[in-house]
Amino acid sequence: MATPSPTKTTWKLQEIVAHGSSVSSVVLGKSSGRLVATGGDDCRVNLWSVNKPNCIMSLTGHTTPVESVRFNNAEELIVAGSQSGSLRVWDLEAAKILRTLMGHKANVCSLDFHPYGDFVASGSLDTNIKLWDVRRKGCVFRYKGHTQAVRCLRFSPDGKWLASASDDHSVKLWDLTAGKMMAELSEHKGPVNIIEFHPNEYLLASGSADRTVRFWDLEKFQLIGCTEGETIPVRAILFSSDGGCIFCGGRDALRVYGWEPDQCFDTVPVGWGKVCDLAICNKQLIGVSSAQSTISSFVVDLTRVKMTGCAPQGPVPAEMPISQPAPAGTSLRRIYERPSTTCSKPKRVSPTSDDEEKESRAEIQNPEDYKEIFQPKNAISRTPPRNSEPFPAPPEDDTSILKEPVAPIPDVVTPATSNKNNTEQLQRPPVAASTPIVCQEPSPVPAPQSKPPVISAARNEPIGLKAADFLPAVKTSSPTEVVDDEAVSQIRKGHDTMCMVLTSRMRNLDTVRAVWSSGDIKTSIDSAVAINDLSVVVDLLNIINQKASLWKLDLCLTVLPQIEKMLQSKYESYVQTGCISLKLILQRFLPLITDILAAPPSVGVDISREERLSKCKLCYKQLRILSPLVKSKASQSGRYGSAFRELHLLMSGLE
């Protein structure tokens, strides 16, 4: 019997241009694992199938960029929040808007549907959480307690609790019936990006910018576990269907963790970049990621992933469900019990007014896919519901198919028909024959002619740092045939200059490190500023920002001029460090500065007060200089536009 060719554990389904501008939010439908919703800076919400390149439906109505999107459990409703603070709820079966909800004063950062009621929770940059009754078109309750933006909201499986994660490093649990906070979980050392309830037990997982996933016992409200090993902030986590493990999507890999005891069961390399959301369907994990205006979908075969302390035994037969033993120590933990309700399906909400319906249109761009996905839900023949087939796994890459060696790429490539055909053949993704990609012709995104204003820190290749940037421009002759000596010379070009740059940076860091070892942070910052190398200042601030107690008023006076340079830098990492540092200064010292400046003069001579007053005046002056810069960048789109809008909100007291 011939041995079947091995198939891949992970593979890429497709990559599509989702919006005409940057993609700001991507979410998967958790029920089917087949629907994707994207929100963009073009103020639209687009619906996609994870394995088809055509947009199913485009929802309009928002007048500002969409910041967050969320499906309900049945994938019949979708809610989207915008930068202006408004929410819009659409009925996907009827292809029309249901509600427009207004009330937040800033960006809507997080959303979640109640598991079986007509309620939506929203968290905002204004630090407030609001519970909305979609049927009655109003705010039911407002939860206050966070001091920074609310990044994630999740209802408990029984619908009695609401968990919120915030940039203030905390996770809060709210009792919906009592309308008050039950507990605050504050062990994280960085902003909390994502939270998920265990599907059965009283357990909560939270992922943070401190690169850890923490597990919380919701009976005792105590930390019971913490993972280590993530290299970037955690933004996507998902419990397995039976709750035996948790999946964590990193930049280059999918990690499978257990708790009690803490352990990493498996690490699966996946090249999905910035993963945004995860879902499980048919023993496959679906992941979606975004980069600028494009989104990509990936599949991980869970039958080949180790999800317990034992090694996987190969593909699982179709009739056997995937199951793992419960982690040790969890057998005594309570499980959720859904309270009895009169019906298993929420009552249909009447559509909103005609005026809002005209403003918020649902443009069905692919009628066939729309009818296939949404219309059969109203038919009797759909009982029991359809079971989608798993995506077929492509075979492992075989290098033997390369019959001819690849010729070296010349400096200038002239267009030719044969080259075009070869390119199309090489770029065809490994998709099943039942999912054609000829319905539309998304042209590849052309390389920008001008240098982008900000160079992303999340990239797969070096960008922006070229040795030629440090050398005078030299006119080159017309391209000729490259010989070996010229090729070697071209490869080594700029090497000496780059070595000098790196050697100088290492010398500067050694100088600052010698001062830092004495424990004088102010002197360390002064020496870094005196060196006149902004990269050294950025490295030093990245350490100081991790511990807010290190900040002092005289340190602010030195750092604020450097922050102005960082915010105007073309490098994303510099801008990010500048935003974090300025945010810490505004939160910790702006109230102190304004109080001291507003206080009446004291009687007599107080030297320490005079020094403090002088420092406050200088800091206030520098903050006033930064205010127009922050305001101008607050109108930008994308992730850093949101960060600058938050800074602008904090600086409103200066005006």
Swiss-Prot record:
Stored Pfam families: Katanin_con80 (PF13925), WD40 (PF00400)
Alphabetized UniProt keyword annotations: Cell cycle, Cell division, Cytoplasm, Cytoskeleton, Microtubule, Mitosis, Repeat, WD repeat
Highest taxon of source: Eukaryota
Gene3D superfamilies in the cross-refs: YVTN repeat-like/Quinoprotein amine dehydrogenase
Compositionally biased spans, kind Polar residues: 415-426
Function as written in the Swiss-Prot or TrEMBL entry: Participates in a complex which severs microtubules in an ATP-dependent manner. May act to target the enzymatic subunit of this complex to sites of action such as the centrosome. Microtubule severing may promote rapid reorganization of cellular microtubule arrays and the release of microtubules from the centrosome following nucleation.
PANTHER family, A to Z: KATANIN P80 SUBUNIT, KATANIN P80 WD40 REPEAT-CONTAINING SUBUNIT B1
Name of protein: Katanin p80 WD40 repeat-containing subunit B1
